[in-house]
Amino acid sequence: MSMNDPLSDMIARIKNAAQRKRSKVSTPASKLRARVLDVLADEGYIRGYSLVEKPGAFPEFEIELKYFDGEPVIAEISRVSKPGRRVYSSIKDLKPIKNGLGISILSTPKGVMSDTAARDANVGGEVLCRVY
């Protein structure tokens, strides 16, 4: 089965694992997923991730989810820009998520970064997802 939107698949896996209170979740590896996971780790939404390579299988990322008082740190994660409807935002159109408690993850000409990093770099781009 082919996967039309790998990033949406990763987001769904993270959501489902957090709802089931799993400590780890795995997802197929890709460069875009690695960059999004880097942003999530830097912002403190996940503990980290590691690349797992098994002989004869595709490489996977094993993501360690983060919890606080038994509740997932990621309360909500949603895909914004989809293959059928791309969403782009300029620097002045980037609004804070949940009064600054959440982040947007953008794909910019300078790489994948959070909305605060994009404001600091004065660059806009495609809004991949929102996390809070």
Swiss-Prot record:
It holds the Pfam family Ribosomal_S8. One of its GO terms (cellular component) is ribosome. It comes from the Bacteria. One of its GO terms (biological process) is translation. Keywords: Ribonucleoprotein, Ribosomal protein, RNA-binding, rRNA-binding. GO terms for molecular function: rRNA binding; structural constituent of ribosome. SUPFAM superfamilies: Ribosomal protein S8 (SSF56047). HAMAP family: Ribosomal_uS8_B. Part of the 30S ribosomal subunit. Contacts proteins S5 and S12. One of the primary rRNA binding proteins, it binds directly to 16S rRNA central domain where it helps coordinate assembly of the platform of the 30S subunit. Belongs to the universal ribosomal protein uS8 family. This is Small ribosomal subunit protein uS8. The lineage of its organism: Bacteria, Pseudomonadati, Pseudomonadota, Alphaproteobacteria, Caulobacterales.
